[in-house]
Amino acid sequence: MKFLFAFNFFSLYIYLYEFLCIHLCGSQVTPAGTVLNSNSALISRRINRRKMKNCNNNDLLKVLKMETTYNELPAHNLLMSSKNDINKLFDYINKNEELSKLMNSCGTYVYLKYLGVVIFSIKENVQISHLSEFIQYLLNKNVCIEFNQNVML
């Protein structure tokens, strides 16, 4: 019953939002459907990653073996998820001085709370040896990592 009420309330909220914004603000409003579709794609990708035992790809192996450069990477953003709480892992990395320096030399991250994923943006002047070491640490902590061209910080 609570779920049905919450769903109906959410639907009512969306209809009111569409009416007020589109009719009063004009047509310069981005429709909510595209945002929901991109979030659902991230959610389904996260679920797929958690089900897979080996969720890492050949591009990561090239980074680990230091056989690539920044310009040869398929994307400059990494989508990360884990069966464990990935937010706690990144909190630990931030508190550890050595790991924090390593992570900051590689790039920056944003934790998406409701999706339970991290989007990591690789710095343009990253040393592949540092990136390799950071990725190896994450893989040892059972983090699924994917190069993703569709997400940006």
From Swiss-Prot:
GO terms for molecular function: serine-type endopeptidase inhibitor activity. Residues 127-153 are annotated as: Dispensable for parasite growth in host erythrocytes. It is found in: Secreted; Parasitophorous vacuole lumen; Cell membrane. One of its GO terms (biological process) is negative regulation of endopeptidase activity. Keywords: Cell membrane, Membrane, Secreted, Signal. It is a peripheral membrane protein. Residues 1-27 form the signal peptide. Acts as a specific inhibitor of subtilisin-like protease SUB1. This is Subtilisin propeptide-like protein. It comes from Plasmodium falciparum (isolate 3D7).
